[in-house]
Each structure stands twice: as structure tokens, then as C-alpha cells.
């Protein structure tokens, strides 16, 4: 399979998970992993199909692939926005850290949770990001 097909497949799987009325912990983790894999394959596809002169990215994890792609002048503004503290990658990393955190029962805190609203936000941000990248690359 081509990288773009794998990216779309993982995105479809994550959307199917959101289509369920109730999501359990294992499905939350699968959702996060699928979105991350989809982003990783999308980065590979962009790298493979463009004339961008960058260091190889196949050995990097998802986040660092995008950081390397952000060195491209044509893509810098789009990717940097999503790498910021309010961007897609930060939201995804927060969701992952929430999933793996251990709550300290001795502390009184209000802790952030993963919920359907957050996962829908991730999918919406990802689709908008992907569409903007596609339009930019088609114009270049």
C-alpha cells in the first residue's frame, strides 16, 4: 500500500471509533494511535512525493517527521501552526499523556479528561490541516 492509502486507512479507523456511542479505554488508545499513524504516513507521503530538499525522515517518529517537514519554506507556516501549543500535535500529545497518567489520590485537583468532544476536535483539526496541506502542495 502507498503511504497516502495507509494514512487514509488509519484516519478511517479513527473515525469509525468515534462513530460508536460509547468509547472505552482501549478504544481511546486505539483512536490516538490511529491518528498518530495516519499523521506519520501523511508526512511520509508528503516527503516522498515532493521535491523538498530535507533530511530523510523515515527513521523519525511522527512528531519529528513534521518538525523536519516544517523546515520547508512552502509548508512552514501551515505545519508550525499545528506544532504550536494550541495546535493539533499538542492536543494529540495531551490526550496521550492523559491516557497514560497516574492520578495521585492524595492531591485535590481538577484533571483534564479525554472525551468525545476532544477526539472530535482532533479529527476536525486533522482534516483541516490535511486539506490545507493538499491545497498548498497542489499549487506548488
Q: What spans do the regions from the language model cover?
A:
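Alpha-helical transition-metal enzyme core signature, strongest for iron centers
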Residues: 7, 11-14, 35-42, 126
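A structural signal for alpha-helical segments
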Residues: 2, 23-26, 30, 114-117, ...
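Surface-exposed polar/charged interaction patches
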Residues: 17-20, 69, 136-139
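N-terminal interaction modules that seed assembly of large macromolecular complexes
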Residues: 19-56
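Charged alpha-helical initiation segments
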Residues: 1-26
Amino acid at each position: 500500500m502507498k503511504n497516502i492509502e495507509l494514512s487514509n486507512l488509519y484516519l478511517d479507523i479513527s473515525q469509525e471509533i468515534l462513530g460508536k456511542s460509547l468509547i472505552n479505554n482501549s478504544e481511546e488508545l486505539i483512536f490516538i494511535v490511529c491518528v498518530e499513524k495516519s499523521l506519520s504516513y501523511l508526512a511520509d507521503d508528503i516527503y516522498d512525493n515532493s521535491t523538498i530538499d530535507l533530511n530523510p525522515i523515515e527513521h523519525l517518529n511522527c512528531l519529528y517527521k513534521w518538525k523536519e517537514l516544517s523546515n520547508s519554506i512552502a509548508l512552514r507556516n501551515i505545519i508550525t501552526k499545528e506544532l504550536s501549543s494550541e495546535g493539533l500535535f499538542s492536543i494529540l500529545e495531551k490526550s496521550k499523556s492523559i491516557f497514560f497518567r497516574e492520578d495521585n489520590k492524595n492531591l485535590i485537583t481538577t484533571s483534564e479528561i479525554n472525551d468525545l468532544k476532544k477526539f472530535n476536535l482532533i479529527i476536525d483539526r486533522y482534516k483541516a490541516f490535511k486539506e490545507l496541506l493538499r491545497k498548498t502542495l497542489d499549487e506548488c
